[in-house]
């Protein structure tokens, strides 16, 4: 059983024609995290057992939007994937404004 080390919640205001977003990060330690993204009446989740950097927020800032969309998308529908891509861009903009830096 994995022990939860920390849970962080980000309330991201509406920006770039995207409704407000709730980002829930559960950190299990040792580069292991789960992310839940909620926007409007939809939610997406993904678990990473090794995301190269300690803070998953920095991992979310890497130039890997297509990988994130594939990890989070519930369907292969073009409309959902495009919406999720814009949501991830909004999350990235917010995290950068909060002082998180892109992982090297």
Q: Over which residues does each language-model region extend?
A:
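Amphipathic, interaction-prone secondary-structure segments
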Residues: 2-46
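Mixed-charge, Lys/Arg-enriched low-complexity segments
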Residues: 57-104
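Intrinsically disordered, low-complexity regulatory segments enriched in Ser/Thr/Pro
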Residues: 31-70
């Amino acid at each position: 059983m994995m022990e939860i080390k920390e849970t962080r919640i980000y309330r991201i205001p509406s920006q770039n024609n995207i409704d407000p977003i709730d980002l829930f990060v559960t950190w299990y330690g040792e580069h292991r995290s789960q992310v839940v993204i909620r926007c409007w009446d939809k939610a997406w989740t993904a678990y990473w057992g090794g995301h190269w950097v300690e803070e998953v927020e920095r991992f979310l800032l890497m130039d890997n939007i297509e990988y994130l969309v594939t990890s989070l998308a519930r369907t292969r529908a073009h409309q959902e994937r495009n919406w999720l891509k814009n949501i991830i861009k909004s999350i990235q903009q917010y995290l950068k404004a909060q002082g998180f830096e892109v992982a090297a």
